[in-house]
């Protein structure tokens, strides 16, 4: 192998690198990662090069614990991603999923490097890019894509504390969510309308705070989730029924409609025990695990934490999934935010939900974990959560 390595392309070098790393030969593996990254760069495969430079930087940071060791590789990755962003936004049809990934990687790197100046600079630039995209989609009456773009613009303006801009975007989102909700109601899509009302409530909170405007809209979301559950039940879809009911439970909880939330939660728990048993009897353990997580969410919503953690632990024994971990942390944070009327926690919940909606579960998990750690009132439930996950402090 040593005699032919110079003839190998970056793909082969990358495969060999990870083989070395998996064998415990970290130093040799990282040298090959660097060579593979340079090879991809020479072939103008910027995305692959950026990915490997980022990986190299994070491994060096983890092993050495020194930012300076990781800085060259991470900066190389960041600027390659910036090149990719510039290329993407000049295309006739922008791939917003690819753009999301590139922008997230750049900001993650500058956040890791504690480079506040570049973090704010590029967050501001990305916000403007997404705002322009949102306007373009809106002009073409593509409301779902306009919403996606404006949501990203809102998040990036929040990073820069540009109050005027993020309030402006929030106002635009209120209009678009309202339009989306109306369209879905006209089509008889209760769940789609409920999701739009839920997100509309979040934008209202950005302007008015945790007040009656937010509460009324969140209550409307709850009613539509409840209506969607009845439609699903009439169609014999019990899985969709309970999914909508758990969403209704938490919408009512955030709307401070505690009695309705509790009643739905208790009834949903009963249904879920039967559904889980049915999935298990058919040998569908994966679906049973998903419903066990839903059961845990419903139990957290009615403050039955010990039972919730037992259900969650059972789910993880069947299937360990990052999305499960995010869902449980969100349930804990929502329950706490509702019980305390804590707008700061709700702000963090919305950030976590944003990244979860992008399927960036690592970032969502990190944000949710940080929020849990900050609150001493959550120490007991946090310890129970870690125990269920097999993490001992």
Spans of features found by a protein language model:
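Alpha-helical segment of the N-proximal tetratricopeptide repeat
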Residues: 5-42, 134-140, 145, 181-186, ...
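TPR-adjacent "capping" and linker segments in tetratricopeptide-repeat scaffold/adaptor proteins
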Residues: 1-12, 23-24, 117-126, 167-173, ...
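Residue-level recognition of tetratricopeptide repeat
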Residues: 18, 38, 51, 58, ...
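Structural motif corresponding to the intra-repeat A-B loop/turn of tetratricopeptide repeats
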Residues: 23, 43, 63-64, 113, ...
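Alpha-helical repeat scaffolds
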Residues: 70, 126, 133, 275, ...
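Hydrophobic/aromatic packing residues within the alpha-helices of TPR/SEL1-like helical repeat arrays
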Residues: 33, 40, 53, 74, ...
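TPR-repeat structural position
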Residues: 26, 46, 67, 96, ...
